[in-house]
Amino acid sequence: LKPGEFLQAVAFKRQLSTERSTFLELGNRRHGFAVAGLALRLEIEDGSCTMARIATMGGGAVAQRISSAEAVLEGAAIDETVIVAAVAALRAALDPPHDVHADADYRRHALGVMLDRALRSKETLW
């Protein structure tokens, strides 16, 4: 978006039976906004991840995709080794801000926990 523009609506196509997505958020509600958040979208066919999209907020100056963690997942069966590697790739790619709401290490840790939980969720991996 350009300065002065705002997002009015978002439309999503219907998920296929092979697709799963989730969004996790950590917030300090006294202040009214999220400290960090993670969106995950996977396509899994025959037990392997054929497509992964991971986006974070609070992991850098702006919301961002984490392509290094996506690359760990794509082409792999999501098991313990792959989850640990994807979380490590995500944390290495982040440059979170440090401010009065949360420091950088806290945000980096929290986003890694969010990815770990999302990848282990039965709703995500059915």
Residues covered by each model-derived region:
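C-terminal structural segment of proteins
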Residues: 1-126
